[in-house]
């Protein structure tokens, strides 16, 4: 389980700070969120390290999550099933196709 806090900058990018087991904080940008409530009973987020130039390849990270009532903190969980990964991959591919248009 990884803790996270949301932060918003003035450029319109939403950020999230991940805190690992040793207490190290790493800033990530949120690429997109996926509503999986109807199918899986949880939501998902795709992240990449903040500050990476747009033309550079990045490794995306995907998690399921549940936010607190204020929507400012919550717990990220590892994605557990192939069905969840398939749904996230489909949403990501659609997102990328729309971005290229």
UniProtKB/Swiss-Prot annotation:
Signal peptide: none annotated. It comes from the Bacteria. It holds the Pfam family DUF1292. Belongs to the UPF0473 family. This is UPF0473 protein EF_1204.
């Amino acid at each position: 389980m990884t803790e996270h806090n949301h932060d918003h900058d003035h450029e319109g990018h939403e950020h999230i700070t991940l805190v690992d087991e040793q207490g190290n904080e790493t800033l990530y940008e949120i690429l997109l969120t996926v509503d999986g409530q109807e199918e899986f009973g949880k939501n998902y987020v795709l992240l990449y390290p903040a500050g990476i130039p747009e033309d550079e390849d990045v490794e995306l990270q995907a998690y399921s999550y549940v936010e607190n009532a204020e929507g400012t903190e919550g717990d990220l969980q590892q994605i557990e099933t192939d069905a969840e990964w398939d749904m996230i991959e489909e949403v990501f591919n659609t997102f990328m196709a729309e971005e290229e248009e």
